[in-house]
């Protein structure tokens, strides 16, 4: 996590990110920071946002197209339903993450989850399988992003101590 923060601070994005957790505001703030440092402001033709049910081919087309400004492009996938996705489609997403991480920084691929539980329950007996018997694909995606030199960011609700620190820093300004 510290390496991800360092990259965001100096303005050099990693090739892939997985952002999720219970705090939507933190998730959106980090997502907007990544998009703005990737495409110099976060607006324009080099930013692609997908939400909900979208195919890996569509995301791949956006990731590998030629940029207008000659810089980096950012492809954001929000709340993709990996649990209901077919096995072949999920394998395409896995291949896409691997290919983007090998591209050398011309594309930044971000998976953001607001309404999907990204952390497995601590009391669950089967950590890798869901209630339907399928593997937990969100967890598999997190591991793949981490393995491919990407950033995994869990945005949990701040504790009381963290809130006090934020208030102290704000008041000190």
Q: Could you say what each language-model-derived stretch is?
A:
Residues 1-173:
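Conserved beta/loop motifs at nucleotide-recognition and modification sites
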């Amino acid at each position: 996590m510290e390496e991800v923060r360092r990259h965001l601070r100096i303005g050099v994005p990693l090739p892939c990110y997985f952002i999720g957790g219970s705090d939507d505001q933190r998730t959106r703030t980090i997502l907007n920071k990544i998009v703005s440092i990737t495409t110099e402001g976060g607006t324009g033709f080099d930013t692609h946002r997908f939400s909900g049910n979208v195919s890996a081919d569509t995301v791949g087309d956006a990731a590998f197209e030629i940029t207008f400004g000659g810089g980096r492009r950012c492809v954001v996938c929000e709340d993709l339903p990996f649990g209901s996705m077919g096995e072949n489609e999920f394998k395409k997403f896995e291949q896409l993450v691997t290919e983007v991480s090998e591209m050398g920084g011309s594309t930044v691929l971000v998976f953001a989850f607001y309404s999907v539980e990204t952390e497995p329950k601590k009391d669950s007996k089967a950590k890798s399988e869901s209630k339907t018997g399928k593997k937990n694909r969100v967890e598999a995606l997190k591991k793949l992003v981490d393995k491919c030199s990407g950033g995994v960011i869990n945005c949990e609700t701040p504790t009381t101590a963290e809130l006090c620190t934020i208030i102290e820093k704000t008041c000190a300004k």
